[in-house]
């Protein structure tokens, strides 16, 4: 099982250079999403297709009444605006919250709460859409331009593919470090010197990062039989806590044994805490209650819980006005990389890692010139 619900975006520029999606045997989700609407105790599923990629279903889904024609037109205009120009321009200009941005685009509360909140709340791992609009614009563009895919062997195949180029003999894991210096690491009571040290993590604090609950189920069959993500459109006005559900094995059959299905539910940490669900048992029961209302209690009762994962530092905080760069702090400081140095995404992590490697090469070759690596702000 992946640690959390992970997908790759094929539109990520730097990731596409560093990762061969074909060699990982990636398979895509279908563009768009399904949404579940619970009314008077009865669940209804509706499809929100992408009219740019699936024009016929896009037109049909525009007539299902889930969103108004006015909202759909405004979403279309927003898509056209965000997908134009250079990617770097997405990180310039206004830096308010995602909610502020959507409201400036004159989207209705219904569209925001029913569609954008469960989708992007589940991506950003926060339930108020307080993430910087710059990151929203970037992720929205990536989703519009590319596909969400699952590698055959899970998300771990991404670092493993990079490790192959380095050579497993050159990688040592599982060593507890007691002290970090620019050219030395202290572990097992001794100082070990190196040509250079790169710190690829942030030191967590009580207020650092966002947390998420991911619950994986083993089901005898898929409850959706669809290669879409299912969004909870009632998240804002009910006691439910699940942001979205996916059946990864519908997309990538290798994720479950033959004749079984893997069902994965995502619960944003601050939503669970707000609703008073902070233990594994209470979160699992709340998730089963949600899914039982959508798919039927009889169906969900046959599912076996495979894992209840509480990931405490799943993403760095990228609130509006929080400007992070991808450069080492100054002078001879230890080089630091990771998504916390840029923005919380696979692209942010890989782009930061590449830039740190360029800086490391510069130092090792005694090059005094400034590295002109990519610098982005959030």
Would you name each region that the model predicts?
Residues 25-27, 169-172, 302-304, 333-335:
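Conserved beta-strand segments of alpha/beta enzyme cores
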Residues 248, 253-378:
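Conserved flavin/dinucleotide-binding core of flavoenzymes
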């Amino acid at each position: 099982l992946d640690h959390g619900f992970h997908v790759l975006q094929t539109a990520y520029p730097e990731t596409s250079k560093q990762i061969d999606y074909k060699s990982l045997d990636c398979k895509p989700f279908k563009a768009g999403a399904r949404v579940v609407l619970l009314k008077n105790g009865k669940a209804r599923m509706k499809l929100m297709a992408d009219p740019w990629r699936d024009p016929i279903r896009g037109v049909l889904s525009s007539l299902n009444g889930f969103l108004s024609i006015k909202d759909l037109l405004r979403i279309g205009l927003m898509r056209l605006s965000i997908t134009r120009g250079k990617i770097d321009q997405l990180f310039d200009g206004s830096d308010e919250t995602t909610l502020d941005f959507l409201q400036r685009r004159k989207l209705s509360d219904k569209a925001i709460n029913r569609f954008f909140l469960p989708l992007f709340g589940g991506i950003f791992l926060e339930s108020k859409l307080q993430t910087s609009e710059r990151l929203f614009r970037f992720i929205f563009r990536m989703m519009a331009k590319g596909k969400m895919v699952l590698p055959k062997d899970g998300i771990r195949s991404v670092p493993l593919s990079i490790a192959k180029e380095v050579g497993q003999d050159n990688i040592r894991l599982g060593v507890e470090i007691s002290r970090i210096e620019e050219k030395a690491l202290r572990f097992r009571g001794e100082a070990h010197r190196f040509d250079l040290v790169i710190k690829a993590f942030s030191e967590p604090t009580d207020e650092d990062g966002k947390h998420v609950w991911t619950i994986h189920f083993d089901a005898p069959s898929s409850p959706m039989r669809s290669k879409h993500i299912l969004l909870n459109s009632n998240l804002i006005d009910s006691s439910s806590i699940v942001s979205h559900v996916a059946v990864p094995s519908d997309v990538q059959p290798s994720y479950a044994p033959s004749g079984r299905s893997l069902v994965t539910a995502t619960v944003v940490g601050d939503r669970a805490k707000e609703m008073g669900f902070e233990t594994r048992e209470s979160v699992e029961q709340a998730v089963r209650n949600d899914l039982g209302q959508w798919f039927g209690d009889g169906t969900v009762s046959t599912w076996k819980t495979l894992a209840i994962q509480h990931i405490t530092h799943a993403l760095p905080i990228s609130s509006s006005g929080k400007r992070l760069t991808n450069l080492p702090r100054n002078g001879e400081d230890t080089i630091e990389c990771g998504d916390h140095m840029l923005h919380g995404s696979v692209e942010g992590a890989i782009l930061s890692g590449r830039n740190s490697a360029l800086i490391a090469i510069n130092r090792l070759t005694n090059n005094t010139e400034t590295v002109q690596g990519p610098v982005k702000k959030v």
